Amino acid sequence: MDLRAFIRLVPDFPKPGILFRDITPLLRDPAGFRAAIEQLAAGTATMGSLDYVVGIESRGFILGAALAQHLGLGFVPVRKPGKLPPPVLSQSYSLEYGQDQLQLHAHALRPGDRVVIVDDVIATGGTAAATAQLVAQSGAEVGGFAFLIELAFLSGRKLLPPEIPTHVVMVDESN
């Protein structure tokens, strides 16, 4: 199933000059949502044995939890600061204008665990790379990355380790 028809393009959101990819029409459609999860799951076949799906706030929670259920794995959320009770691991990363931070429960993952990191969109790659650093801090290993949409013109993959498999369902070349 071609999922592009379910992605709504919203110009100048959340800021002028941004073309937002709205996945809510996809989530609303049972067949489309199921196909998206199946296509994400198919991409994990090259990632070896996995223990957990790590979902990045916030749309990565939706896709990640559904993918975890589909694969029979546990789900671990990565959140913005102040959303998880302590103890947490923290990782700062650069934005276009400043810094941001992500957090992971300190005991959510253990050494030897293997995870796939999931988000709806890979744009600049900053949040995915920061999440991979959080996973490494925990002693776990990133087995792969899975994204619904890649904004290829932003070259976000360059921040991801090239030796780790990255699966993308849809590549968007337009800006």
Curated annotation (Swiss-Prot):
SUPFAM superfamilies: PRTase-like (SSF53271). The keyword Kinase does not apply. It is an enzyme of class 2 (transferase). Pfam families: Pribosyltran. One of its GO terms (molecular function) is adenine phosphoribosyltransferase activity. It catalyses: AMP + diphosphate = 5-phospho-alpha-D-ribose 1-diphosphate + adenine. Catalyzes a salvage reaction resulting in the formation of AMP, that is energically less costly than de novo synthesis. This is Adenine phosphoribosyltransferase. The lineage of its organism: Bacteria, Bacillati, Cyanobacteriota, Cyanophyceae, Synechococcales.
